[in-house]
Structure formats: structure tokens, C-alpha cells
Amino acid sequence: MSTDARQPADYQTIADLDEGARRVAVLEAALELDVFTTIGAGTLSLQEAALAIGADPRALAVLLDALCALGLLDKSSAGYELGTAAAAFLARGSESFGGDVVLRMSAARRRLADVVRSGRAVGDLAALSGGDFWAEFASHRLVTWAEEVEEEFATWRELGVTADRCPGARILDVACGSGTRSFGLAREDPEVRIVALDSAPVLEIAKKLAARMGISERIAFRAGDVTSTDLGSSEFDVVLLSYLLYFFTPEDAHGLLDRVWRALKPGGLVVVRAAIADEKRQAEVDALLNAVDLLLWLPSSRVYTLNEYQDLLGGAGFGEIMRRGEEIITAVRPS
């Protein structure tokens, strides 16, 4: 393309990226200094906060005021106190604390250039999978679950998985996380039974959510590794794979989908949720930034395009493969 045919250069894209980086820097600094935990449930004056944190008062004031502007702190004549989001998600001791996830991901992202040069991951994904990282990653839904469950249930209605059309469904939620994506089905239909599969630490979050929703007796919690756990044979009407397949190479994804096919009853439905890359890999921002995050931990990972998902599902024996939304693909095990 000639220079004359191009759009005029717009610096706003660069400015917007820099603005995002400034906000992240403020959040990182506050987490590293343990600002939110130090302030806790009370109100601290600047001098009290500086003494407790071990910081220069003037410099700390600049940081705390910026946190107020970002809505994470509130400021009064008495001093600083936590905003509702900071109290829920950024203060240690909260059951929905997620600050360590933010710090760990930020530290990994700062090493992106090293990963690109070497092709080697910044850390061991297996260590993340077996530890508390994903439990903390899911924990914010202990606060936000009500709205999310309603949104997810609306999606299930669009897919035709409801009490009147699929009564008493047997559902397998693979890598279930907090459970918000499937648990609404059990609340709507008392006869629904869900097998929630994930690591033991993550299942503790899912158990808390099920208890709050009053559906614990309808959920079977199964601790296991999604790469190797036996999923059963012809047991389920629906299998849900949420934001999972892009952790797998095509060969490993095919292996998982083979097990999913066997786990489904004939005529059963697999629902794949994923950030789907456009075919040219140049336009879908969420999908392509997800690919960057995955690269940090698992260089062999792949954010797939729609055509690639169709090939994976078709190769595993599924039919009626359809894109049903921005991040949803469904397919059926033939009867």
C-alpha cells in the first residue's frame, strides 16, 4: 500500500496504551507495598499509612491520591480508606483476594521480550495448575457470581439447554473454575446433575459458590487433571469446555476431544467457549492478547481460529459444528 493511500497517523492508539501502562504501574506499586492490606477495614491518615508501610510520606501521598482517582481508595479529612473493589479483591484476608495473580501476571508480562527471543516460558505452567494460582484467579466470582450466573443462564437458553427442552440433564464441566458457567442450570432445574472437574484448590471455590446458591447436592466435585482424568463413557448430555483448548497443542486437543466424545451420550452436545482468533490473526484483540499471555507460560499453546476449531471437532467425530456467539462453538456427537 502506498503512503498516500494509508490513513493519517493517529497517535491516540499509542497514548491509550501508555495510559493503560500508567494505571497498571500504580496498581502494581500499591500491591507490592501492601497498601490495601495495610489500610484494611479502617481509615489511616497519611502519616499512619507511611509509618505502617515504611514509605516516604510525600511520595506515598502521590500514590494514594492516584488510587483515589482510580476508584480504589476513598479519601476524607480523617485519611484514606478502601473502596469497595479494593476491599473485596485487593486486601489480603478477603476470600476473593486476587492481588497475587495480578503481580504474578505483571511480572511475567515484563519478560515478554525474553520469551520471544528464546521461545522458552517464564515459569512452569504445571506449577500454576497444581497450586493456588487458578483458585485465586477464580475467587473474585465469590463476589460477582450472581450477575454472571444470570448472564450464563441466558446463554444456555439460547443454546436450548433448559429445563423444558433438556430436563434432568447430566452435565460435565471440564476445568470448571468457580462454576459460574454451569451452576445456573442446576439452580433452574432441580433434576440437573453436574460433574465439576478441576484441581482440588479450585474446587474449594466452586464448593463455596454451590453452597451459596443452595445447589451443593446437585454437584459432584471431582478433583483431577483434565489432561488425563477419565471422563467416562456415554454418561453426559452436555460437556462444557470453557477457555481450555487453547492450552493444548492440536494433537493434545484432539486427544481431549476424543475423551469428550466418548463421555457424551449419542446426540450429546459439547460447548466450547474460547477467545477465537480471526483467520488472518490480525483483528481479534482479546484472542490475540490471550495468545501473548499463553506464550509466557506455555509456548506450545495456540489460540485457534474458527476453521481450526472446526477441524479439531470434526476430526474427533463431532458433527453439526456451529459458531453460536462471539466466543461459543457447539458440536454434537452423532446419534
How does the language model describe each region?
Residues 17-21, 29-30, 61, 65-168:
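Conserved Class I S-adenosyl-L-methionine-dependent methyltransferase catalytic core
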Residues 166-177:
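Conserved class I S-adenosyl-L-methionine
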Residues 178-189:
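Conserved SAM-binding loop of SAM-dependent methyltransferases across substrates and taxa
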Residues 215-226:
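Conserved SAM-binding strand-loop segment of SAM-dependent methyltransferases
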Residues 227-239:
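A short acidic, Gly/Pro-enriched loop at the edge of an enzyme's catalytic core
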Residues 254-266:
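A short glycine-rich, Lys/Arg-flanked "PGG" loop and its adjoining helix->strand segment in the class I
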Residues 273-315, 320-321:
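C-terminal alpha-helical "lid/dimerization" subdomain adjacent to the S-adenosyl-L-methionine
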Residues 316-335:
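Core SAM-dependent methyltransferase catalytic element
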